Amino acid sequence: MKPTTRPKPPEPRPAPRAANTTRGSTLFEPSKATSRLDAQGTAARQELNDGWYQWVADNCLRDCAPDSMLATMVQAGLDADEARSAITLMNRSPGLLAARKFQQIQRKLESVLANQQKLWELAPHYEQVEKRSGVSRDEFVERYAIGSRPVVLTDVTRDWPAMRKWSPQYLKEHFGHLEVQIQAERNRDPKFEQNKLAHQRMVRLGDFVDQVTGGGATNDYYMTANNEVLRRPEFAPLLEDIGPLPDFCRRGDLARSVNFWFGPAGTNTPLHHDTLMLLHTQVVGRKRWRFISPLETPHVYNYFGVFSPIDIDHPDLARYPLFRGVKVLDVVVEAGETVFLPLAWWHQVSGLDVSLSVSYTNIDLPNDYEFVDPQIRDW
């Protein structure tokens, strides 16, 4: 609940409680919050309102140290005795005691995931994404789909017309007059992927080709999935350029399961997980894929939807200490190669070159799954 009369107090940025905090621990301390100062430079008096009570409850469930919570509250302008009493009463409250029961169940589930992850990491070359050719249907299903392992297939596009025809200039010459949907102005929004509907724009494909090829490396614009390009009759020749598929894919379902990607070097798809399995083929250019096991979900701070706030390139370990020790699989997918994304694997993708890609979900296995996603916006 938000404060009724004053702004919600600043949320603490968690940091490890001690240098020897173990991986998987939920012990956090809040960092110092910025005080509101009056004209004399002293902390302005705040009321202990509903926003503060929720803040105390949140941090009790995070196992923050009471002294650390008290210091933050006093620095923000709360009376020390009132703040100390609020912390004490919260730890004894029936609501928090009930929440502790569910917390125990959650922590048991997290421990099961953590122990299973330890077993997975015993596999030789766990952190290496294999590059394979000649993978049979049976091996793909058992080793990679059901076995839940990413893999790069190097021979899928061997007979694809797209490999000799597609280029940005080809798109401009044959389809440049058509309008397509892109994502734009992404650089001004740290949550551009979560807010992707707000970044949709319609542009002429020819103009977008010029922008991509002439604008240098950037993440500001990108034609991403769900643009429906390959479902439109005008773009049927592109769909026909996708040649034979592996025998673990249903060719007849391709048209309704394929997405087209086109963007410059420098694009970044933030850390998230998909809700089904897919294949992603590079036709032009290269992309760098980083993968994190779905068993590591408790350690990537998935507070909202399918997204993680962690940037693998620059992880803020003071704010997200549980990410320390998470193993990241790293592979560059070259033109002509196809990466398999197993169910629920976290991934962050970076464009290394101007690239044209297609992704498709018509895998000949059950590929419709349900996730109960959190919708917490105030952590």
Task: Give the residues covered by each predicted segment.
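N-terminal accessory scaffold of Fe(II)-dependent oxygenases
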Residues: K2-R17, R23-L27, S31, D81, ...
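Eukaryotic low-complexity, mixed-charge intrinsically disordered interaction/regulatory segments enriched
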Residues: G24-R92
